[in-house]
Amino acid sequence: GRDGADTVKTIRPESLANRLESLTPNPRIVAPGNFATPQTLLKLVDEVLPQYTLHMLNAQGTIPTRDGVTHETTFVGPGMRRSPNLMYYPCRLSLTPVILRQSLPVDVLLLHTSTPRDKMVSMGLEVNILPAVFEAVRDRGGLIIAQVNPKMPHTYGDALVHVDDIDYCIEVDEPLMALEPSPPDEVAQAIAGRIYSRIPDGATLQLGIGGVPDAVLGALTGRRGLRIWSEMFSDGVLALHELGCFDTDVPLTASFVFGSQRLYDWLDGNRLVRMRRTEVTNDPGRISRTPAMISVNSALQVDLYGQANASRIKGRIYSGFGGSTDFIVGALHSPGGNAFIALPSWHPRAQVSTIVPLIEGPVTSFQHSSVVTEYGLAQIFGNEEREQVRQLIEHAAHPDAREALWEAAKAQGRA
């Protein structure tokens, strides 16, 4: 059962403000990102500190943005995309804890937790890099502050924190950001249909963020004995669970979750789901030892060298490496594993092909098993480079783009 929140050392916001004022000038503050943003704490910090650095992964919604606030991240979310004071550190998700330990010393960790059960609160939807930061802040003698929220689901694994290990808590009753699942469009369904046949019963799945990975999950209703080992999941996992598609002897493992309120209600107190820290979920060695590891990630562009851009638009940083590179490497080494890059063949708003001769900006990932669009599956891994080009043009590219792509391939001396 639940203990009352009176087992937490609560502090009045005014007293916390006094404590924050005594911090060293321009402190570095880490807060949960994704859908676990601690809005109340961030507002309080922003009112007290004239100048600080705010580090969040995939920041969503409204976060403090003004002169004096530097935004810092290894994965840019919509909350930071237009920030004039953005410091972007290119880094795979599995290595982000290393950067925060070695290069970016943290003064304050903000947490957004559940109410306590048996003297433990839970980080709920967002574990990710937070345990690593927790340890680093402890070692430096920094501050750990939590906002304790009855609406945050109580999840298990590395999400749990003993109440005595938190310096200060404030009590909030704050709605969590939620996202209702939307039905996949025709293009996403077509792509999912091509990947479906490559996913056997008993496979372990990692799916990235976006409509296409969601559609792939939606296509797997006939599979059995599936497992989840992923940095994140959303409502598609709940739908498959309800249809009996998972091996229930093995926990569904992820590092962060976002989705609907219905998903959050299912997560609360659910021991079938195990939240693990980034260094565990995204460890390429661990991923490679998982048989039939299937990784499905999206991209903005793929070029004729099989390189993917999933992080920049017109050279400007849009997201980051994230964990896709960790899983692509791991899945390629997995016995029976596959790493798919899945994307529509045509960018509807820009009216251009997503299969391009050469990516203009930095590469997010390379060496994938296959590139999949609504037109087909291009087998990349194991093919000679000219056959890779042929596969990409004939199987993945939009028919209207193929002639120009063949011309480009000839100019590259690869056709």
What are the residue ranges of the model-derived segments?
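Conserved alpha/beta enzyme-core scaffold
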Residues: 4-415
